[in-house]
A protein has these predicted regions:
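Bacterial N-terminal signal peptides that target proteins for export
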Residues: 4-17
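Early exported N-terminus immediately downstream of N-terminal targeting peptides
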Residues: 38-118
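Bacterial N-terminal signal peptides
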Residues: 15-27
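Short hydrophobic alpha-helices and adjacent helix-cap/hinge residues
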Residues: 34-36, 60-63, 196, 203-207
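Sec/Tat signal peptide C-region and signal peptidase I cleavage site
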Residues: 27-33
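Surface-exposed, charged secondary-structure patches
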Residues: 120-159, 211-224
Length: 224
């Protein structure tokens, strides 16, 4: 069934990967849980719609739009997002085959660095708005994974958007967003693979710590 949500977000991904907190790996709060009151699991689509609706409430809050409330607004957005994105899964997929070669300690360090990279990439775009509708077209599920199909209805063109989610303990969490064929995870993986090939994994970590990694996240990435 097609569902439409009116919204004022230029790019959903600007918000979905804005949070810079590894606490995104913790359990969701009751208001964001993807189970119904009787304990029955809801769909991945409902999880995405719930997240968008919560974000819209914050973005449309006139009090939080005041300049002196900028930090509070950002905090409230982060509180929503950190319960809805699986940063570990995202980092694992972005690093690709190199992930399995790392120790648990190095994996944790990489997740920390990756989340900070996401935050640096998207932090400046949080105020980008335009009146759009999100039309949910359906979802595909295979075991613990789901692909929620949607369209952003623009004034001139419609843009296909896929939300990719993984189920963790009866909760659906986003680990990638594909906008008009451009996957955020794939673009990071392409860049990371190139840096590792040229410099080694240690070189990649060094560049991430120096904030010297720049990825055009909404462009279709070439094969690594």
């Amino acid at each position: 069934m097609t569902t439409i949500i009116n919204m004022k977000i230029k790019s959903l991904a600007h918000l979905l990967f804005f949070s810079g907190m590894v606490a995104g790996l913790t359990m969701a709060s009751p208001s964001l849980a993807t189970t119904t009151p009787n304990g029955i699991e809801s769909s991945a689509t409902e999880a995405v719609k719930g997240t968008i609706n919560d974000l819209i409430q914050v973005l449309d809050d006139e009090t939080l739009k005041q300049p002196e409330q900028a930090e509070e607004r950002r905090h409230e957005i982060e509180e929503i997002i950190k319960h809805r994105v699986d940063y570990e899964e995202m980092a694992k997929r972005a690093l690709g085959a190199h992930w399995s070669t790392l120790s648990p300690r190095d994996q944790h360090e990489f997740v920390d660095l990756f989340v900070q990279l996401l935050r640096d990439t998207f932090v400046g775009r949080i105020t980008e708005h335009s009146d759009e509708q999100v039309v949910f077209l359906g979802e595909l599920r295979e075991e613990a994974f789901a692909d929620v199909k949607a369209q952003m209805k623009g004034r001139k063109i419609d843009t296909p958007v896929d939300f990719r989610l993984i189920r963790r303990a009866h909760e659906w969490r986003v680990y990638d967003v594909v906008i008009d064929g451009a996957s955020i995870v794939s673009n990071y993986r392409s860049q990371f693979t190139s840096i590792i090939r040229d410099l080694s994994y240690v070189g990649l970590v060094k560049k991430m710590k120096q904030k010297a990694v720049a990825v055009k996240v909404f462009e279709k990435s070439p094969a690594p």
